[in-house]
Amino acid sequence: MIKAGFDSKDLAKRGESLIRQASNRYLTTVRIAFRAKQRRFDDFDGLLEESSVKPVQRSIIELSDEQDQPDLLPG
């Protein structure tokens, strides 16, 4: 899913893509922050494996993947 040695340029491109394709930049920023907060608490609860990727970085990658590959989402 998310590799520990990710490229910072790729992360920046993903973040820019999220903001660029958003109808509301503020809500996109809030979604990223909320997802990061969830991941942080999941890390504390031991629900996620130990990772060197910070929660904000992980949330940008996850939201970008969801945006680029909507067919992977349930429902």
Curated annotation (Swiss-Prot):
Classification via Pfam families: RNA_pol_Rpb6
Annotated GO CC locations: DNA-directed RNA polymerase complex
Enzyme Commission numbers on file: 2.7.7.6
InterPro entries: DNA-dir_RNA_pol_omega, Pol_omega/Rpo6/RPB6
Catalyzed reactions per annotation: RNA(n) + a ribonucleoside 5'-triphosphate = RNA(n+1) + diphosphate
One annotated GO biological process: DNA-templated transcription
Record keyword Transferase present: yes
Record's keyword terms, sorted: DNA-directed RNA polymerase, Nucleotidyltransferase, Transcription, Transferase
Uppermost EC category: transferase
This protein's record includes keyword Lipoprotein: no
A Gene Ontology molecular function term of the record: DNA binding
Quaternary state and interactors: In cyanobacteria the RNAP catalytic core is composed of 2 alpha, 1 beta, 1 beta', 1 gamma and 1 omega subunit. When a sigma factor is associated with the core the holoenzyme is formed, which can initiate transcription.
Cited function: Promotes RNA polymerase assembly. Latches the N- and C-terminal regions of the beta' subunit thereby facilitating its interaction with the beta and alpha subunits.
NCBIfam families: PRK00392.2-5 (NF001574)
Similarity comment text for this entry: Belongs to the RNA polymerase subunit omega family.
Protein known as: DNA-directed RNA polymerase subunit omega
Organismal lineage: Bacteria, Bacillati, Cyanobacteriota, Cyanophyceae, Synechococcales
Name of the encoding gene: rpoZ
